[in-house]
């Protein structure tokens, strides 16, 4: 066993590149050679796309009626996009079931021990309900995060491999959810083969072990264009902890255009899995070219509205930072 800077034994074949944070970690590589501690937090890469020196912004929008039902038959003319209050020109629009790069991020802390079997079953249900061309990876986390696909794969479409990864149970320790999400965002950015990217996060408590901040993860998620769907199996035994967890999960969903779920019982996770898969497959893809092409690093607030009968709700990412498209330092999760 090799012991890393956080005082926890790590499998011998693990690789720890250090999560992005102000704290410095001591690390060792596969062959025991020292790994340089991370430097200052790098500039986060923009989720916008550059084509011939023109920046475009990709959005994935979900539209629901007052009863919570998806509205999937709206034309392009029904949508209006605003950036910092200024109406933008939509250059591409479609509603179709496209394959996605999907990350399943599952809490493996001690408090999840009795819930894992139902959560694993629900995760597989989500995959089976999703587009058959989706590519999937699995990250289990307690006080550290592990990318757990067999043979060190980055993604798989094999249900048996996903099942094997989800069953790598080591339910103990704390909850480093933010670290796990930040790693997963970077993994999608570097390795994903699909344009649309989704993370589904299942946890039962407030983060108590991460090195990266919530602000860092929210910003990274906004820049990447990933949709985050958090599922919080939160206990009311410690109301203040549950409230903090609920706020953090809500912030991630709101920033990215995803949706939060707070089931009272773990048995409800199966139904939620069906809902999330259905939502992902019935969204609108909207592309616009910002009228303001300057790279001034400011936050650009995005608002999408719909002109159609009935009270409708639109979910999409809340904005992005106008920064140049450049590589971002990446976190690393050990493979087991």
Where are these regions (language model features)?
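N-terminal secretory signal peptides that target proteins for export/translocation
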Residues: 1-12
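Intrinsically disordered, low-complexity regions enriched in serine, threonine, proline
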Residues: 3-5, 28, 52
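Short, low-complexity interaction segments enriched in Ser/Thr/Pro/Gly
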Residues: 9-10, 28, 33
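N-terminal cationic leader/targeting segments used for protein routing and processing
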Residues: 13-14, 37
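Bacterial N-terminal signal peptides
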Residues: 17-27
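Scaffold/interface architecture of coatomer-like assemblies
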Residues: 31-336
């Amino acid at each position: 066993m090799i012991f890393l800077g956080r005082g926890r034994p790590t499998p011998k074949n693990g690789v720890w590149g250090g999560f992005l944070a102000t704290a410095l970690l001591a690390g060792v590589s596969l062959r025991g050679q020292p790994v340089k501690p991370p430097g200052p937090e790098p500039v986060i890469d923009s989720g916008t796309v550059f084509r011939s020196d023109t920046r475009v912004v990709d959005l994935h929008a979900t539209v629901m009626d007052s009863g919570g039902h998806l509205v999937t038959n709206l034309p392009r003319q029904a949508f209006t996009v605003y950036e910092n209050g200024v109406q933008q020109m939509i250059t591409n629009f479609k509603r179709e079931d496209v394959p996605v790069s999907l990350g399943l991020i599952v809490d493996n802390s001690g408090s999840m021990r009795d819930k894992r079997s139902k959560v694993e079953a629900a995760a597989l249900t989500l995959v089976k309900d999703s587009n058959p061309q989706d590519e999937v990876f699995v990250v289990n986390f307690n006080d550290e995060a592990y990318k757990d696909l067999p043979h060190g794969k980055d993604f798989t479409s094999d249900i048996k491999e996903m099942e094997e990864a989800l069953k790598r149970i080591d339910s103990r320790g704390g909850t480093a959810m933010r670290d796990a999400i930040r790693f997963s965002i970077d993994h999608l950015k570097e390795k994903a083969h699909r344009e649309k990217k989704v993370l589904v996060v299942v946890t039962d408590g407030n983060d108590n072990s991460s090195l990266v901040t919530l602000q860092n993860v929210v910003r990274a998620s906004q820049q990447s264009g990933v949709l985050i769907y958090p599922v919080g199996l939160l206990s009311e035994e410690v109301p203040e902890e549950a409230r903090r967890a609920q706020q953090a999960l809500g912030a991630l969903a709101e920033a990215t255009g995803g949706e939060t779920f707070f089931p009272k019982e773990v048995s409800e996770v199966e139904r939620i899995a069906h809902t999330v898969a259905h939502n992902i497959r019935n969204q609108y893809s909207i592309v616009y070219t910002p009228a303001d092409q300057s790279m001034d690093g400011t936050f650009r607030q995005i608002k999408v509205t719909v002109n159609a009968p009935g009270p409708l709700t639109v979910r999409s990412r809340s904005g992005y930072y106008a920064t140049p498209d450049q590589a971002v330092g990446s976190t690393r999760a050990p493979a087991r």
